[in-house]
Design a protein with these regions (language model features):
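Beta-alpha-beta core module
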Residues: 117-120
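Phosphate-binding site of ATP-dependent enzymes
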Residues: 1-76, 99-104
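Active-site "cap" helix and flanking loop/linker of ATP-utilizing ligase/carboxylase catalytic domains
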Residues: 38-91, 122-146
């Protein structure tokens, strides 16, 4: 019934299976996966409100509460995605990690958010790169013909 309503409203739909597990997002800056954040929304889904309203009380854990071995695997996958997709500069890859330790890459964002509420600047800050340094790095990197 819901699908029929949606098909009446939209021309096409994509249906994906829900993967139960932790939401981990990993930043790649240049030639290094610098770190990750675990997203713990208080809402049922990590939607617009959970991302951008302080009243949503979404928790960001840096580093994520996973084993160091699992975190290293995730960072390697994020970096590999960055390279395979021929990305330059900054990317953010989003993952789901099941209780069994299975890693699912959901997407790689080639233009991740760069606001004060965005995850890449937050991850960079926790690894010693404040917002000004991050933006300056991006400007300098944009001038490199690789």
């Amino acid at each position: 019934l819901k699908i029929k309503k949606l098909l009446n409203k939209y021309k096409s739909l994509i249906q994906e299976s829900f993967i139960e597990g932790k939401e981990i997002q990993t930043a790649v800056i240049g030639n290094k996966a610098i770190g990750s954040v675990e997203i713990i929304p208080k809402r049922k889904f990590y939607d617009f409100k959970a991302k951008y309203l302080s009243s949503a009380k979404t928790i960001h854990k840096i580093p994520p509460e996973i084993s160091e071995t699992l975190h290293l695997k995730i960072k390697k996958i994020a970096f590999k995605a960055h390279k395979v997709l021929k990305c330059k500069g900054v990317t953010r890859s989003d993952f789901r990690v099941t209780k069994q330790g299975l890693i699912y890459i959901l997407e790689t964002n080639t233009q991740p958010g760069m606001t004060k509420l965005s995850l890449v600047p937050e991850i960079a800050m926790k690894h010693g790169m404040n917002f000004k340094k991050l933006v300056n790095w991006m400007i300098n990197d944009a001038g490199i013909n690789r």
